[in-house]
Regions:
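Short pre-catalytic strand/loop immediately N-terminal to key active-site residues, enriched for Gly-Thr
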Residues: 10-15, 192-205
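Charged C-terminal helix
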Residues: 53, 226-254
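Conserved N-terminal subdomain of the carbohydrate kinase-like
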Residues: 2-8, 20-107, 254
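Conserved phosphate/ATP/ADP-binding segment of small-molecule kinases
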Residues: 116-191
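Juxtamembrane transmembrane-helix boundary motif
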Residues: 77, 91-118, 125, 129-137, ...
Length: 254
């Protein structure tokens, strides 16, 4: 029997809009007990918004501390460098038979091109071991090394990511191609589904984290992958609609 224990491996957003704050809020709203292994910290400094990776040994000790917990799903968020990603992958390989959602965060302005390239290669190694990946357009372009300029390009990118080992893919398009509609493409290796909702003129900080953690939550609650993606899309829409100055709000009044 599945437990209600669910893990987020993600970073700390100092303003609590995204990252582990969004993950834990999403888990709680869905009646689940959330755990966190912190991959990085953030702060606003004289250089701007900075990401500080957790020391690799300390990160590994966090995962070791959680090794005996019977998780029913895991969501992977920002893995700031290859060392942290490698330790996360080792941990994931040991968690057999449970859903794993990978939000392949690759776009941090603090990262140099070579670091992004190395992290890209490392994240691709996760693909065979996760249930679904949820890249945005920029991340999908970096992962596939193809330009995405249309809905058809999104579908081709999803197919390519599947051929690279991902079981299920959601390419998040946002309002890139239609200013009034937010379009995402889901692909399971056989069928496409275009997820479509109106664009809200609201703060959407944390939307990507919430989307991935919502998918993970729905999988724990017994939904199929396609059902989980659809439920997560609707949940994120409402979270954006109720957002505040710091990001989306998961625990809005229903």
């Amino acid at each position: 029997m599945m437990t209600k224990y669910i893990l987020a491996i993600s970073g700390n957003d100092i303003f609590s809009g995204g990252g582990l704050s969004a993950d834990l809020a999403t888990y709680t709203v869905n009646g689940l007990k959330g755990f966190v292994a912190v991959s990085c910290l953030t702060a606003v400094t004289e250089k701007g918004f900075e990401v500080f990776p957790v020391d690799g040994d300390i990160f590994g000790q966090q995962l070791d501390s959680l090794a005996d917990i019977d998780f029913s799903a895991i969501k992977l968020g920002l893995l700031p460098n290859v060392e942290v990603a490698e330790k996360a992958l080792t941990f994931i390989k040991e968690q057999k038979g449970i859903p794993v959602v990978l939000d392949p965060v690759l776009v941090c302005k603090e990262n140099h091109d070579l670091e992004v390239s190395a992290l890209r290669d490392e994240l691709i190694r996760f693909f065979p071991y996760v249930t679904i990946i949820t890249p945005n357009l920029t991340e999908a372009q970096l992962l596939t090394q193809k330009t995405i300029e249309s809905l058809e390009d999104m579908k081709e990118a999803a197919q390519m990511l599947h051929s690279m080992g991902a079981q299920n893919v959601v390419v998040k398009g946002g309002n890139r191609f239609r200013k009034d509609r937010a379009l995402d493409v889901f692909y399971d290796g056989q069928h496409f589904q275009v997820l479509d909702c109106p664009v809200l003129d609201k703060n959407n900080t944390g939307a990507g984290c919430t989307f991935a953690s919502s998918i993970a939550s729905q999988l724990v609650l017994g939904k199929t992958v396609q059902e989980a993606v659809s439920e997560a899309k609707a949940f994120v829409y409402q979270a954006i609609e109720h957002s505040d100055d710091y990001g989306v709000k998961q625990n809005y009044e229903r």
